[in-house]
From Swiss-Prot:
Ranges occupied by PPR repeats: 132-166, 167-201, 202-236, 237-271, 272-302, 306-340, 341-375, 376-410, 411-445, 446-480, 481-515, 516-550
Family annotation (PANTHER family): MITOCHONDRIAL GROUP I INTRON SPLICING FACTOR CCM1-RELATED, PENTATRICOPEPTIDE REPEAT-CONTAINING PROTEIN PET309, MITOCHONDRIAL
Keyword Repeat: yes
Annotated signal sequence range: none
Record-linked InterPro entries: Mito_RNA_Proc_CCM1, Pentatricopeptide_rpt, TPR-like_helical_dom_sf
Family annotation (Pfam families): PPR (PF01535), PPR_1 (PF12854), PPR_2 (PF13041), PPR_3 (PF13812)
Name listed for the protein in its UniProt record: Pentatricopeptide repeat-containing protein At5g38730
Record's keyword terms, sorted: Repeat
Family: Belongs to the PPR family. P subfamily.
């Protein structure tokens, strides 16, 4: 009864406000104490709804004017319901731009992607389904473009559950965002649901799907899509064909790529420079510079080679150790009006550094500076690595400092090069500092990084420094996790210091860290190859009890690390198999290797 009286009172207030607005006496609305909170969200929503019915006053203009005016009051703020109602009214009267802008503001302020919120918005109004679908489609686009893929999918699922159909553009944007994030499995799931809802795919949707095939390296699926397109009367365009050609070229399937080009030309679609660049990139990547150059010369008169064409060829010649031809092509590139960018310079710089031509590399850097071409991470990492290889750590550190001063951030490759360089010159304190900095920045050192440090300590007969390294991790508040112990133990075992590896292993277990298959198998093999079969068997027992298995990756890694131990390895793996610590599929792999 109380709720009914309250609803009746709100309805009377809403009618009174509507009458006041229609008479143009806006100041009298304040008598209803709008700004004091007496005018509830439900009343505002009702007023907006009723005012929209007076089409003689210009469609939604009265509703919109009231919405804006109410929003301008000092203590007034529109609720989610009143804002949503206004968006639907604007959409109904095809004021799409204003509705879209209001929806964007609402999406920034409210958690619209919550299923509970979405259900309340749909359930709270009896609107034209097409209007609701329109607004939800905009919301899908908003979240997808903002990189909030999961939110966009939630809205899509809400549209489905309401029996509505999303707009084609919204589906295209969502699919495209999923492809960019490499979520190809989700792409196909959304596409199937979209088709079931009655959304008819056009050339743009199919191009997104072909692009998804490109991302996942699946030319067979792309070919099926082309067949499906032709069956449905959707004709492939230049983007479709170029994407498929690119997939084949990346997989070195050049005959198939040429077949696609032939089909493309027979269907009346002329190749463009992107088509040629795909072929040139494919051949250059494989070092087939003769074919790449032939294609370059065959570029038709109505197609012009671009910056990418020349850069791809220059990179190809650098990879094939023909720096002179790469430099000649750079001159041709400049004479044709194309300015080499940082990618072009990086290719040449990499080759000069590989050849130890550091002076020429520095001259190239000076040239880049003169042309206002800013070095990127690849430029700096190439130089740091080159200096570290020739043990010029002073110059490597200078490049590092310039890199930081220019606003670039050190990445995993920068740190690894510096750590390796400092370990080579036995400046292990500096190597440790780079290691700690690397971890603090969120990068995970791998086996190679820890190996360099272990080798450095052993070369200086400072085995105890490894234990101190673990202690320093704790002092700095860093996590001495299983990955750290794994890297150290693996390298120490490789150096045939299995007794010290055992010390680290016991230290790890005392801290509550549980060893994995890599640690146990590595130590077991270290014992095995030194004739300590009993100790190895004890580790196998623990592995069996903990259900730790040798996988294919571990099998290949240990076999590669100890490639010279053929007979020892064969007996070791046979024993591992007898202990049921290796799967049948890996045993078959071992047998095939032995046959070969």
């Amino acid at each position: 009864m109380v709720n009914l009286l309250s609803a009746n009172r709100e309805a009377l207030i809403a009618q009174s406000i509507c009458a006041t607005v229609l008479k143009g006496n806006w100041k009298n609305i304040l008598k209803h104490k709008v700004d004091s909170g007496l005018l509830k969200s439900a009343i505002t929503t009702q007023v907006i709804s009723e005012l929209s019915l007076f089409s003689g006053y210009g469609g939604p203009s009265l509703s919109w004017s009231f919405f804006i005016w109410t929003d301008s009051l000092p203590s007034s703020k529109h609720s989610l319901q009143s804002s949503w109602k206004m968006i639907l009214i604007l959409t109904k009267h095809k004021h799409f731009k204003t509705a879209h802008q209001l929806l964007d503001k609402l999406a920034q302020r409210e958690l619209l992607s919550s299923p509970l919120v979405l259900r309340s918005l749909v359930g709270g109004v009896s609107e034209d389904p097409e209007d609701v679908s329109h607004v939800f489609s905009w919301l899908m686009i908003y979240y997808a473009k903002a990189g909030m893929i999961n939110d966009s999918i939630v809205v899509f699922e809400q549209i489905r559950s309401c029996g509505l159909k999303p707009h084609l553009q919204a589906c295209t944007v969502l699919l495209n965002s999923l492809v960019k994030q490499r979520l190809t499995d989700t792409v196909w799931k959304i596409f199937k649901k979209m088709v079931k809802l009655g959304v008819v795919a056009n050339i743009h949707v199919y191009n997104v799907l072909v692009h998804a095939c490109s991302k996942s390296g699946d030319p067979e699926k792309a070919e099926k899509l082309l067949s499906e397109m032709e069956e449905k009367g959707v004709f492939p365009d230049i983007f479709t064909y170029n994407t498929l050609i690119s997939v084949y070229c990346k997989k070195s399937m050049h005959f198939e790529a040429l077949s696609v080009q032939d089909r493309m030309e027979r269907s009346g679609v002329a190749p463009n420079i992107v088509t040629y660049n795909s072929f040139i990139h494919g051949f250059s990547r494989e070092g087939r510079m003769r074919e790449a150059t032939r294609l370059f010369r065959e570029i038709k008169d109505d197609v012009t080679a671009n910056h990418v064409t020349y850069t791809t060829l220059i990179d190809g010649y650098c990879r094939m150790n023909d720096i002179d031809e790469a430099l000649r092509l750079r001159e041709v590139m400049e004479s044709r009006g194309f300015s080499p960018g940082v990618v072009t310079y990086n290719s040449i710089l990499r080759k000069l550094c590989e050849d130890g031509r550091i002076r020429e590399a520095n001259r190239l850097l000076t040239e880049m500076s003169g042309k206002k071409i800013e070095p990127d991470n690849i430029t700096c990492n190439t130089l740091i690595n080159a200096y570290c290889k020739i043990e010029d750590m002073v110059s490597a550190v200078k490049v590092k400092k310039k890199m930081i001063e220019s606003g670039l951030k050190l990445d995993m490759y920068s740190y690894k090069a510096l750590i390796h360089g400092f370990c080579k010159v036995l400046e292990l304190e500096n190597a440790k500092e780079e290691l700690f900095s690397m971890i603090e920045k969120g990068f995970s050192p791998g086996y190679a990084t820890y190996s360099w440090l272990v080798d450095g300590f052993y070369n200086q007969n400072k085995q105890d420094e490894i234990t101190k390294l673990l202690e320093e991790f704790e002092k700095r508040g860093l996590c001495a996790d299983v990955a750290l112990y794994r890297g150290l133990i693996r390298r120490i075992c490789k150096l045939e210091q299995v007794d010290y590896a055992k010390v680290l292993f016991e230290s790890m277990e005392k801290k509550g860290l549980v060893g994995d298959s890599v640690i146990f198998t590595t130590m077991a093999y270290a014992y095995w190859r030194t004739g300590k079969v009993t100790e190895a068997s004890a580790l196998f027992d623990v592995m069996y009890n903990r259900r730790l298995m040798v996988n294919l990756k571990l099998y290949k890694s240990i076999s590669a690390s100890y490639a010279g131990d053929n007979d020892v390895l064969r007996f070791f793996w046979s024993h591992v198999g007898d202990r049921c610590l290796i799967s049948k599929s890996i045993l078959r792999e071992m047998n095939r290797s032995e046959v070969l």
